[in-house]
């Protein structure tokens, strides 16, 4: 906010229910968040500061200035505003703080924990940094928290993983569930993340 020098400016807006600005989208007015701006400052400040350059002919000329800004926290607010449901955030994979969350349903069980850690380590070796939920909480709490955080892929490791020798992979965006052996789930994760 505030007045910048220069005759031309552009603001880049993202529609957002709680936005402080109102913009026209099609024929309707919608609330929006400013996520970026450009101000063409010309030579107003460079001339005053003596910020010059030599042109091709050796003449001293004032620099033509511009101001470009991206509001990172506003951009994240805009992304969340566009990518959520009643359960929480649904991070786009490209900007998710973590691509994979491993939910350990019984962290007190050594075999379950060992399996979860092996998944964690294999993903790390592949250049994928997972988030490990090894808290001593009920599974329902972990599922709710995982959806709230919005990590794109959730790997569920529990008693069934040991019994059936499988893992469950859940996608946050569409709630799709895949149950397959560990190696196939790891391959699926790498394919989804690395293409």
Where are these regions (language model features)?
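NTP/phosphate- and nucleic-acid-binding module
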Residues: 1-195
